[in-house]
Amino acid sequence: MIQISALPAFTDNYIWLLQDHRSQRCAVVDPGDAAPVLAWLEQHPGWVLSDILITHHHHDHVGGVERLKQHSAATVHGPAREKIPARDIGLEDNQRVSILGWEFEVFAVPGHTLGHIAYYHHGLLFCGDTLFAAGCGRLFEGTPEQMHHSLGRLAALPDDTLIYCTHEYTLSNLRFAQAVEPANPDIAERLAKVTQMREQGRMTLPSTLALEKLTNPFLRTGETSVKQKADERNGQDNQSQSAVFAALRAWKDKF
C-alpha cells in the first residue's frame, strides 16, 4: 500500500510524497525545494528516495531536483519537451511509467507551460499547475484553447479521481468562483468549509474531480450561468467554450 503525504514548501506549495512502506522506498512530485524532502528522509532512516516526478519546468517545481539527485541518485522523470534539471527520463503524451510498482499514464496538458504533463494512476491525478482546486493555472506559455482542451481531457477522467495539485490556492479560487456563479449553492457550501479549514491551518487538498465539476468555473464553461457572466465581463457573445474560458481566465488574472 502506498501512502501519499504533503510536504509544505515556500508559502503555498505542496511537494507530494509517495511512500511504499513494504520496500521503504519513496518518490516525490515537483520538489521545488530539497529541504523538506531531505528533512523527511532524515526523520525516516532506512528510507530511500527512488524517483522524482516533474510536471513542468518552473523553478518552484524543480528547484530541489539537483540537490535531491546528488543526495539519493533518484531517477528523475519529467516532460520531454521542457528543460528539466538532471532529468533521466523524458516523457511524452500517452507514455506509461512505473513508480513504486504503480503504473502511471502521462498526459500532455499544455497551457500553463507548453510542455506541461500530468501523471494519472487509477483515481489519482498529479496535475502540477494545470488544474487547481476550484481553479486552473495562469497561461504563461500556452493559449486559452490549449488550456481549455487540457482541462477537458482531465475532466474526462472518473469523477472519483483525487486531484493532487501543487498549490494551496483553494480559498482565493473559490472567492472568484463565487463571483462567477453567486447563486451556485455548491460553491457557497465549499467556500464556507474551506474558509473554516484554512482558519484552522488545515490543507484543502486533495480535491475530487466530482467536486471540481460542481465548483470550478474553468470546468463549467458549458454552463449557461458561467457563459452569461463571461459575456457580461467582456461585453460580447462568447461563441465557444474556449472563448468563455479565455474570458474567465483574463478576469481571474486581475481578480
Swiss-Prot record:
| Classification via InterPro entries | Clx_II_MBL, Glyoxalase_II_hydrolase, HAGH_C, Hydroxyacylglutathione_Hdrlase, Metallo-B-lactamas, RibonucZ/Hydroxyglut_hydro
Q: Which reaction does it catalyse?
A: an S-(2-hydroxyacyl)glutathione + H2O = a 2-hydroxy carboxylate + glutathione + H(+)
The protein's enzyme class: hydrolase
Q: Which SMART domains match?
A: Lactamase_B
Instruction: Give binding positions for Zn(2+) 1.
Output: H56, H58, H112, D129
Binding annotation for Zn(2+) 2 = D60, H61, D129, H167
Disulfide bonds, paired cysteine numbers = none
Name its pathway.
Secondary metabolite metabolism; methylglyoxal degradation; (R)-lactate from methylglyoxal: step 2/2
Q: Name one GO molecular function term.
A: hydroxyacylglutathione hydrolase activity
The note on the cofactor says:
Binds 2 Zn(2+) ions per subunit.
Cofactors that this protein relies on: Zn(2+)
Reading the lineage from the top rank, the first entry is Bacteria
Q: Which UniProt keywords apply?
A: Hydrolase, Metal-binding, Zinc
A Pfam family recorded for this sequence: HAGH_C
Q: What is its EC number?
A: 3.1.2.6
Function, as annotated, reads:
Thiolesterase that catalyzes the hydrolysis of S-D-lactoyl-glutathione to form glutathione and D-lactic acid.
Q: How does it assemble?
A: Monomer.
Family classification: Belongs to the metallo-beta-lactamase superfamily. Glyoxalase II family.
- Protein's name according to its UniProt entry: Hydroxyacylglutathione hydrolase
User: What lineage does UniProt assign to this protein's organism?
Assistant: Bacteria, Pseudomonadati, Pseudomonadota, Gammaproteobacteria, Pseudomonadales
Give the gene that encodes this protein.
gloB
